[in-house]
């Protein structure tokens, strides 16, 4: 059996499970020997007390003999741990207030950190489901001027694929909204157009059926096949096993199902979930118009995904791709004018758009750092609580040590108590993490779907319990060692006397750290609050109040250009006549947002660099509806709004474009060249509109407005200014659309105010959470400050009594107490200001209209903490003034 024989093992197991009976036998045996030894002492002429004392000395300490016997007969470590847990539970039940405060202190920090960790895990860390070897995948992005739609064609991607040996595979993709019909009407679904061996590059295995064949992926294919997601399969086919070969209607066309994606896979990007995948050849069918995918200028794909060849690096792939792209630009000079100054960037990992990953990642790292700082503040407060508890238990520890308890056993018992508190704190922290998750619910990050709040999973729970355990080991050990050293260093005579100065400086240092760290969070929170205020005050160039946007898509349902124009005209006339509607218009883009196509605007015959302006095709009442002022000239007439661009109806320029082209001259009546993907046309300028912004942070967006006319659009926005609620307006407008054609989808209903607020969603979430963390940190710091000051008053009670006995005024006593608080605060403020500046520097790219050295923020934060310090000192000051000098001197 090795070190332990079978007989001894059986004895130890029996002792472990039947320990109570054996303990009674041991007690009886020891008592018998004590009585026999006491009788021998009495026979030698000793008194009864001396005989009993001599008998215990012979045994070398009764408790020690019991412990050594237990260790010899059983599993000592397990028995001791269980005994210590029971002892700690009884001790904590005797002091429920201490236990509740300690558990809540830890739970606050653990809950906050766990909630943010779970959010980061859900958004950034979890791999895309079903993907093989995700570490080998890279995202290739065409990056350049913000606000432009940069796309590559099927032919361009084929050339890049062939010229990049560092990649084992390269595929393009682009997301588009489509509609499918159900029994209740049209429903919007998310479609992804893919090029190349998209599924093969990702290493996916279909749940049912197959992926697209090489023939189906060719530019000349019919494009009439579809792969559906597992979610779509369940929602629309009830998970029927014979789904393969059946058809599904998307927009106005029908597609044959050839495969079902694996469960959990909803596309390369985690942005809400792709429902269906279509080959590139289906692009023309999507919009119900002929599009030759083989045409090199048929740019569709916004991002590419590649798999690195064995032994190749992302840097090498990026170098080869940039060289290949430069050759394409040189070979086809006219085709790449709008992206000639762009470049291909390679980024490791998939799951999020590169810009979203970088921006949201920074925000989540800031949140995680703030939550970790709050956890550290809670841990320090927890350590301080254990130190104060150690002070009150010095007498108990000293007595137990005198009775024979060893130093390791005493330390183990105190550590067990701390770990038990941490375990409860971790469990409560999981509950608080769920509550904090409610703050996330409905919150949106740019490029991500609204958070549903259900981000807490097994990893997050393990993180919570693990952090609580680590906290218990670290922040219970030091207070236990300090209090044990202090208790064992005292004599039995000193037990019960006033406490000494030992550990006082350490406790004060902990409180200084708490206050400084809390001030750091408070300064950062105030910076973010001012940022939100400044963002809300930005003049965007339109009046968003009571303006609602709705989406309709007649063209994908089979409408030609003329039918779509008639449909929009009828929508406008009927919506404008509804009660409560003050203005209505349609446009190709909503007034807020920067994701628009850029056109080249030049003066005829000029060799100057073209002005790139975001386009928007609008109806005549657009400017009235959104509240954008016409600074010169006029808006479109009702007749002009129905004209095709080739008829030269005229355009409206934004103020920035007008100044760039004409300087201070009046541009109204002048001709300009408008160049887009479909060619160049001469247009007269009929008006100049005030500048608008695509977001509160961006500058004025160069824009050109054209009449919507017979433009063929994948989606049209209906803009309504109303004196009604969004839901009421949605019902009215929806009924109009349904009465004209119930098969035309009606979706994306939201207020313009909501869209604007969403643009600063990350800043609002940061401000809300960092502000919450700062408030909790301030409360914890106030509690710590109160504890140190009250402890100081208790320790100096005799001194205060003597001072008052010899004539000290109450004001001087108050000054003594408050002065102690202010000394701690002054040191903490210096450290906190430095920490606040460092934190604000990290927040700099999130701040707007304010700098990390904003003096008002620091003054307000310091004043707030001064008030908190005074409030925390007030109870102790009152207690000090009420000290009775007579009773104090009598006790001495």
Predicted regions and their residues:
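Mid-to-C-terminal secondary-structure elements
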Residues: 5-7, 190-215, 223-363, 438, ...
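Interfacial "coupling" helices/loops that link adjacent transmembrane helices in transporter permeases
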Residues: 378-422, 783-825, 829, 876-879, ...
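Membrane-proximal extracellular/periplasmic loop immediately following the first transmembrane helix
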Residues: 126-177, 299-305, 535, 539-599
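Alpha-helical transmembrane segments of integral membrane proteins
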Residues: 69-100, 132, 352-356, 386-412, ...
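Small-residue-rich transmembrane alpha-helices
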Residues: 118-119, 345, 383, 419-488, ...
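Negatively charged linear elements and acidic catalytic determinants
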Residues: 1-104, 307, 334-336, 345, ...
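Short, strongly hydrophobic transmembrane alpha-helices
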Residues: 97-123, 378-379, 423-426, 507-531, ...
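Short juxtamembrane loops and helix-capping segments at transmembrane helix boundaries
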Residues: 120-136, 143, 273-290, 331-333, ...
